[in-house]
Amino acid sequence: MNGFGAAVVITGCGSATPAQFLSNEELSQIVETSDEWIKSRTGIGKRHLADRSVSLSQLAAQAAIKALEMAQVSPRDIDLILLATSTPDDLFGSAAQVQSQIGANRAIAFDLTAACSGFLVGLVTATQFIRTGTYRNVLVIGADVLSRWVDWNDRATCVLFGDGAGAVVCQANDTKDNILGFELHSDGSQNGSLNLAYEGEELPLKQGIRVQKGTYKPLRMNGREVYRFAVAKVPEVIEKALYRANLTTSDIDWLVLHQANQRIMDAVSERLKLPPEKVISNLSEYGNTSAASIPLALDEAVRSGKVKKGDIIASSGFGAGLTWGGIIFRWGD
């Protein structure tokens, strides 16, 4: 047990991606690049992209319904919905739209924004709500449609991102606590390495008051700095989470990292001395889906039979902010 109130188990997962995709070969007709250039630097083969008729909340709702079905939980029994996203349909948030679409009428719903670390932050937040006894059934969703926020003329960024959603159901349990340990960090001094900033011209309203009138600019990233940051911080934060769980790397059955870049995942697993066969990767199929990437990879691994009940999973999210974190959990109830 955890020394708090209720214990926490993850009882279901689900994911959703758009049917349409853009291959590296097709992308090379849009911007100066090639399949070999992209794969050798990122490991990405294609990315699924949401049509303009598909909303972020629709993808999130599809993933949520699948997770609820696996958990055998009715939407009406959900107490809280946490939507981790940086690309909501509405700047005020999309969680309430998801709540309505899935029929979770009792649930309070709100967005969390922590970029590619968002799902992990949401999972930790859900754990704390359950452990304090506030809620018993929490739906955590990671979803992003970054295809709408990249510069499709910038080959350094447009080759990386895809759209998708993933979700898990967290429930209170009287005996088992399957959230074993976690560690979260932020460093705002490095915000310039990866951001999606609001910029514009000033608009004077009266003497002494000049507001900014503008819009959000496309995503900007310093790839080399993000790589250095991830390779240095991710192994460290996973080891800290393992320490909190009273475990070591030898106890890890699967490593489920934010699917940012295959080079990063390879470097992290090497530093943790984990064999490649323990690393779950679907980067080639989907690219970087930001907050969706961890639950999307987890869901595919569970449904394929790779991840089994009782397996210990180490996971880490890292990205804009800069934010990063690690969590250790046991799969299944």
Curated annotation (Swiss-Prot):
Pfam family membership, one: ACP_syn_III
Active site: 116, 258, 288
Stretch list, region ACP-binding: 259-263
Location in the cell: Cytoplasm
SUPFAM superfamilies: Thiolase-like
InterPro entries: ACP_syn_III_C, ACP_syn_III_N, FabH, Thiolase-like
Domain of life per record: Bacteria
GO cellular component term of the entry, any: cytoplasm
UniProt key word Lipid metabolism: yes
Enzyme class: transferase
Transmembrane residue ranges: none
Catalytically driven reaction(s): malonyl-[ACP] + acetyl-CoA + H(+) = 3-oxobutanoyl-[ACP] + CO2 + CoA
Main location: cytoplasm
Pathway: Lipid metabolism; fatty acid biosynthesis
Gene Ontology MF term list: 3-oxoacyl-[acyl-carrier-protein] synthase activity; beta-ketoacyl-acyl-carrier-protein synthase III activity
EC number: 2.3.1.180
Protein keywords: Acyltransferase, Cytoplasm, Fatty acid biosynthesis, Fatty acid metabolism, Lipid biosynthesis, Lipid metabolism, Multifunctional enzyme, Transferase
Subunit structure: Homodimer.
Family membership: Belongs to the thiolase-like superfamily. FabH family.
Domain notes for this protein: The last Arg residue of the ACP-binding site is essential for the weak association between ACP/AcpP and FabH.
Physiological role: Catalyzes the condensation reaction of fatty acid synthesis by the addition to an acyl acceptor of two carbons from malonyl-ACP. Catalyzes the first condensation reaction which initiates fatty acid synthesis and may therefore play a role in governing the total rate of fatty acid production. Possesses both acetoacetyl-ACP synthase and acetyl transacylase activities. Its substrate specificity determines the biosynthesis of branched-chain and/or straight-chain of fatty acids.
Name of the protein described by the UniProt record: Beta-ketoacyl-[acyl-carrier-protein] synthase III
Source organism: Microcystis aeruginosa (strain NIES-843 / IAM M-2473)
Lineage: Bacteria, Bacillati, Cyanobacteriota, Cyanophyceae, Oscillatoriophycideae
Name of the coding gene: fabH
